[in-house]
């Protein structure tokens, strides 16, 4: 299991058991301190603190762990708020929060609406301002050796991969 698995379970636990996102994340991450690949540097630092505070971080950790919000809430505005709350306990940069909100919202839309991939792409652009790259642009990551873990880059890449998928 990876850090994202542990953190996703922690978010689900917080929602289902009415815990704070912070308490649940700390509990689960401290209980499982050595996931495959480790925690990001920023999240590791946050976990290790006695009284962790959010950092001005826009890493994709928050987008990777937010899926339970999209599955367990049924109101669009509540999903935006809960995604924000789940992110800002450790990452309070607006770009990180927006990445979490976007991923949770996409899950909600796909779960509750009859929406085509074209409509989804348009809605993401309209609601979150993301420009979705082409698959050719994504292939360049490997050939050019460029990659970063920021929400503003990785969330649109993930959306593009979904839009290009057949299932």
Regions found by a protein language model. Give the residues of each.
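Structured, active/binding-site neighborhoods that engage oxygen-rich ligands
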Residues: 1-167
């Amino acid at each position: 299991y990876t850090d994202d698995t542990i953190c996703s379970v922690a978010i689900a636990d917080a929602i289902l058991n009415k815990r704070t996102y912070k308490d649940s994340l700390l509990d689960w991450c401290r209980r499982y301190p050595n996931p495959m690949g480790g925690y990001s540097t920023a999240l590791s630092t946050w976990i290790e603190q006695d009284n962790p505070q959010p950092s001005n971080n826009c890493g994709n950790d928050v987008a990777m762990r937010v899926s339970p919000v999209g599955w367990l809430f049924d109101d669009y505005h509540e999903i935006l708020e809960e995604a924000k709350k789940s992110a800002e306990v450790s990452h309070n940069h607006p770009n990180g929060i927006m990445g979490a909100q976007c991923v949770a919202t996409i899950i909600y839309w796909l779960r509750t609406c009859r929406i085509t991939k074209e409509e989804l792409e348009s809605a993401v652009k309209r609601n979150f301002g993301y420009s979705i790259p082409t698959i050719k642009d994504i292939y360049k990551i490997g050939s050019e050796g460029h990659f970063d873990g920021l929400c503003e880059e990785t969330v649109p890449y993930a959306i593009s991969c979904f839009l290009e998928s057949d299932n």
